[in-house]
Amino acid sequence: MGRRSLVRDTIQVLASISTAPVASLRSSLLYSRNFQSYCLGYARSVSGPGLPSYDPHAIESARQAAWRERDAFGTPEIGEDGARKYIKPSAPFTSGNIHIGHVRSYSIGDAYARFCRARGEQVLFAFGFDSFGLPAELGAIAGKEPPSAWVERCAQHMTAQLQRLGFSFDWERTFMSSEAIMYRWSQWLFLTLLEAGLVYRGTGSVDWCDTCQTTLATIQVEDGLCWRCHNPVRLIQRPQWYLRISKYVAENDRRLEELQASGMWDENALASQRFVLGRVDGIELDLSTADGEPLTVFTPHADALELARFVAVSPRHPQVEEWARDELLAQRLEELRSGGLERSAREAQTMPLVDTGRLLASPTGGEPLPVVVTPTVDGRFGPTAVLGIPERDRTDAVIAERLFGPPVDTPTAGDEAPAKTHTTRTGVSDPVNGVPTREAVRYRANDFTISRQRSWGTPIPIVYCERCGTVALAREQLPVILPLDLTPTGTGNPLAEREDFVRVTCPSCGGSATRETDTLDCHFDALWLWIPVCVPPGEREQSLEHILALEDLRAWLPSERVVAGSDSGNFVFDQRTITKALRDIGPLEFLKDGEPFAGCLFHEMVIRDGRKMSKHLGNVVDPDELVAQYGADTIRLAVLFAARAQRSLNWSDSDVKRCHRFLRQVWDYSQARFALDPASAAEPHDANGSPAEAEPRMGPDKTEHLRNRLEQWCETAVEKITEDLQELEMHSAVRNVMRLFDRIRDYEKRVIAKRGVLCAEDREALIAALRTLARVLIPFAPHIAEELLISSMPDGRSEIDTSWPAGELVSR
């Protein structure tokens, strides 16, 4: 080795030990002559061929092959020892590609799953593809192929992407919701809830395109026109299937206090549940018309009753049906419903408004209050009746203007709370003019439709018979099979055109009948299909009764933690509803509080330049390209490092480069120390690289003190990282891993700067600290971490200990 190259290598050694810029190392007083001599000798010993460079693709390929060979992430048998944790990730739509939001979500869940396994806990970490629904149908229409072929191809591609990223899912338990063996559970759930009165048939508004002869989802209506033919869309009334969640809304609200007290639900998740609930506290009071017809009304403004100008009633209020017996009023109500009862985009100025002609006595003795029916009530208070107080509510002000003309002072768009004038403070239990008031709560959350007029979805197990009416199938007749060769075109419903599907025999009387051709919304599938993940793959084809009796459900439920995007609030709320219903019905009676998830983390989305990623804006980040350039470990580490899960991640290439640089530094530094011959490293050299006399050794107490300090640094780091992982604070955990690496390098710098050599005990402590570093790195960058542990083993042994360190230095 030439003198010039040796000096260059020495500077690189200094840089690997210190975080200071290389230029400053030449003049730093921190580095003594002995330290420089050590580095010259060190560079001489490790330079040349044989020291492995960081090749993420080779490392990741090797580790993933090893994981597959030993089935590293298979779900343990429930009889095995150890605490059990079902970590539930979100179910991806079979959209064709994994996006960076998926990478963030699954990196969080995977880090936690690996951490739990390392601590000796039994982990179930698996998911199913959400392969039914509109996205798959639209993809099939574009490709002019059956949706079954589209979703199969998408699932295969997405699985390969996820496997390249090294996520530790139990792939044997992966499934697609469009598989008959799985969607029979959705049909079972439908029948179970139908028998309990929690599923019912009603009438609702849908968007309809006369040209395409099909119903449209909200996203398919663009400025009132059909997305496909660009002709006008109109709202029609048709029968729909509804899920009655109203029975459990109050319990879902009440249980939130317990979930918050547990400390395992983050504030994002709790806030989403409160938002879905839409709870409003106030009072209710009983009013009546001049002829004694009663109506209970609600208001959140107990201190402004004398300002009431009218009463607004939801079209879904039960009393509206009574009023509909009046022929003229019934016609007006029908016009209201056909005019867009469930169009949330409509404003109060254009929302339908029907004057019932009824007048209620004012609670404060003022002018009688006209009663109007308007869907503006539903979006604020649910299907109820409310006092209209224009001076307190902007929507009420708009309705009052439509009823009575412009007021002298109208609340402007910027007014959050119109000025209070001449109000009398009224307690929630005080009578008003002899009319008693009661504390009351209203919720925006209410029953919703679960059926869709589309072909690619779970068939509804219902037939229609002229003699028997609506007939539910028996559970023994499940599953009702969806034809796999359906090819939707965007016009009509191909399922309704299949005679082999539609024409059946009535299971009740044996006569002719027709099947229901609506299908279940994929949202309904999601309410239950996370539970069959608990069922061993070998048991999936057993009868439903057999599966429900398995101990596996009791062993894995409730899920210890769910990790999902912040837009999953409705899914989680409705899953909480379903588990409470099945607790009461019987199949999940062992969930005493009815809660499906002991803990919940909602992470925010990944954005770029402050905007949501989209192909239209050209700011999409392709995970495949990133993995090809930097490797999976770098991308996983970057999405965890860049921001707390509860904050939006503003994508930056600099974060990726920083994490890649960190992993390369850890690799190069560790490999060099593992490969260093202790005898060569302990031999001091002078500035010319020639042997030199070593300076006197430090006293044994001082040497022990430095090693003890290193051990304390490791213990502190492990404690902090453990706490971070338990709280799913991945951002903080990664930073603490990085700090530990800095501490390890600082240890070597301090010892060598003062003594010029590493004695055997010092080197052993350094190697042990690097093993600890590798083990705490496993949850975040598992491939490189395991490979480092293998490199640290003497004689090339490949058996490594990946258990979670207790904080002590790991000597073997």
Q: Where do the PLM segments sit?
A:
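Amphipathic alpha-helical
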Residues: E251-G278, S314, P318-M351, L478-I481, ...
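Helix-rich, typically C-terminal accessory recognition domains appended to large enzymatic cores
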Residues: E195-D207, T299, A304, E439-C468, ...
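Low-acidity, Ser/Thr- and Arg-rich intrinsically disordered low-complexity segments
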Residues: R3-R8, S16-T19, S24-S28, S32-R33
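Short Cys/His-rich metal-coordination motifs, predominantly Zn2+-binding knuckles/fingers
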Residues: C212, C229, G365, E466-C468, ...
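Structured ligand/cofactor/substrate-binding pocket environments in proteins
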Residues: G101-A113, D130, S177, R184-W185, ...
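N-terminal, positively charged nucleic-acid-binding surface of large information/translation enzymes
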Residues: C39-Q319, V372, P390, R402, ...
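Basic, alpha-helical terminal appendages of large translation-related enzymes
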Residues: N34-G82, S314, V386, R402-A413, ...
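Active-site-adjacent bridging/hinge elements
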Residues: D81-P89, L162-G166, E367-V371, P375-V377, ...
